[in-house]
A protein has these predicted regions:
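Alpha-helical transmembrane segments and their immediate juxtamembrane cytosolic regions
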Residues: 1-371
Length: 371
């Protein structure tokens, strides 16, 4: 059976928007060489000389949490569609487990080769990046497909709150934590093992997405309308927690300006980071649901990118790394970086169109449908 029915265009468009923003961040890293240090729980926290430099980083923040949330949502929708086609629960779970393992393998075997092209050298032996955490979260969430959406909110919330409570204080940044703690909870490490995306904090976002996908399956109209109010509510709670400058922030802010207010801890994702980014994405998703009702162009770039996110991800890293090495070996201005970012998107568009067409010609058993 060849298929491409059942896809929710608004989800694909949101995913497409997120990968475009992610590409901006990586163009900044590989081409402009102006990327800030990460927003870690310890160590030196990034400071920004200008609002433009900060905004170039801020607008990309929704990407990572959005990927985990949308992956969970997609898992619920995939399981529902395949069950309607007669797939047994075991077969559905095995398919998801296989894809989770694939994501981990791609990170360690291929994607890390792109990061080795980092300007000035890489130097890390093992890097645990976003695909590793996405794959590990899928391996866990695949066993929770039958849990009711409301019940999923319990472990999802618990994991995010536990992240706040269990993350060490800033003064312990240089402590030699056990590798298992690194992989599960505490970002950082050494050249032998560096973890940006530990499993447990990001698993919480996946479970929120799985719950939303279950809601979308059971009550599509209610779920579509609810995204706006949940998103606005999340943004309101973000403001309250930032004003409180205590629980929910992992590390308190010292800068009283608006940049300091919006400059939140990402590694691991603080509650304020999650509320800000997911709240924004849900508000955008509501707008995309409204747009979906009146448009259906399959050539929309966001739809194209959003229906081939893994292919886009792997290709764009090597593309921008190559652009940086060939055309901007000494870095470039912000304006030049934006031009190279757009050039990269233009190159990626026909490649993603072609890969999408190839996938659509495959039956549901094809390994290509894992990408």
């Amino acid at each position: 059976m060849r298929e491409n029915q059942g896809r929710v265009q608004a989800l694909d468009r949101l995913r497409g928007l997120l990968v475009v923003l992610m590409a901006l961040d990586h163009a900044n890293y590989f081409v402009a060489r102006a990327h800030s240090p990460g927003e870690y729980w310890g160590g030196v926290f990034p400071a920004y000389a200008t609002a433009a430099v900060f905004l170039a980083r801020l607008v990309t923040h929704p990407a990572a949490p959005g990927f985990f949330f949308l992956m969970g949502t997609g898992m619920a929708l995939f399981a529902s569609r395949r069950a309607e086609q007669g797939w047994a629960a075991r077969r559905i779970r095995c398919r998801l487990l296989l894809r989770g393992a694939l994501l981990i393998g791609l990170q360690l075997l291929i994607v890390n080769r792109a990061w080795e092209l980092t300007p000035g050298g890489w130097g890390l032996r093992i890097y645990i990046g976003v695909l590793t955490a996405l794959g590990a979260a899928m391996l866990v969430a695949a066993w929770l497909l039958d849990v009711k959406p409301l019940l999923l909110l319990i472990p999802a919330s618990g994991l995010l709150i536990a992240t706040e409570l269990l993350t060490p204080g800033v003064s312990r940044w240089a402590d030699p934590f056990h590798p298992i703690l690194r992989l599960l909870l505490i970002p950082g490490g050494t050249r032998a093992l560096w973890v940006n995306y530990p499993l447990l904090p990001w698993l919480g976002l996946t479970l929120f997405g799985l719950a939303f996908g279950g809601w979308l399956n059971r009550d599509p109209t209610g779920a579509r309308r609810g995204t706006l109010w949940i998103g606005l509510g999340a943004l309101a709670v973000f403001v309250l927690l930032r004003l409180g400058n205590g629980f929910g922030n992992i590390r308190t802010r010292s800068d009283g300006g608006w940049i300091g207010f919006l400059n939140v801890v990402k590694y691991p994702p603080s509650l304020t980071f999650v509320l800000l980014t997911v709240g924004f994405s849900l508000v955008v998703l509501r707008l995309l649901f409204l747009i979906e009702e009146g448009t259906s162009s399959s050539w929309d770039p966001l739809l194209v990118y959003g229906s081939t996110p893994l292919f886009f991800y792997m290709l764009h890293l090597f593309l921008y790394a190559g652009i940086g090495r060939l055309f901007a070996p000494g870095g470039t201005s912000a304006g030049g970086m934006l031009l190279y970012w757009l050039l990269g998107l233009a190159v990626l568009y026909p490649a993603c169109v072609g890969f999408r067409a190839l996938k659509r010609r495959q039956n549901s058993r094809s390994p290509l449908r894992l990408f």
